[in-house]
């Protein structure tokens, strides 16, 4: 008997600056983010991409990807996509793009990945405020000799 529905496994989830697809259908990820370092706050990120790959499932599914604020309740961005896997040996790759994300405060933000409302992964994305270095102050100018 052939199973009609098996919830898939999340093979990977990576936040990056951009995802591109080559002519041969392979993906390459640009700027994989482990943290986000910013020189000032608030700041707006033009684009953040979340690359998710699913495998070992059978059926039709809805993936939900959420970007959560440091208070762990405010959903800053949310994306949903439908996908299907015909057999357990297949995989599906989804890319969710979040645009114009405003970081008002430093702290730990979170990416949550769900399939059919079942949480598969939640991982931290620290936003660190690192002000640019200040130029060294010039030494005081000695007074001009009196003539």
PLM segments and residue spans:
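Contiguous segments within soluble domain cores/interaction surfaces
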Residues: 2-106, 110-147
């Amino acid at each position: 008997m052939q199973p009609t529905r098996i919830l898939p496994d999340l093979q990977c989830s990576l936040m990056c600056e951009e995802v591109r697809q080559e002519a041969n259908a392979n993906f390459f990820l640009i700027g994989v983010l482990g943290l986000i370092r910013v020189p000032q706050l608030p700041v707006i990120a033009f684009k953040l991409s979340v690359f998710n790959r699913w495998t070992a499932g059978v059926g039709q599914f809805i993936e939900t990807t959420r970007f959560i604020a440091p208070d762990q309740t405010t959903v800053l961005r949310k994306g949903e996509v439908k996908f299907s896997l015909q057999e357990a040996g297949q995989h599906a790759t989804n890319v969710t793009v979040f645009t114009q994300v405003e970081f008002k405060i430093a702290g730990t933000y979170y990416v949550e990945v769900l399939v059919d409302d079942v949480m598969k992964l939640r991982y931290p994305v620290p936003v660190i405020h690192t002000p640019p270095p200040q130029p060294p102050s010039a030494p005081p100018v000695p007074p001009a000799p009196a003539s």
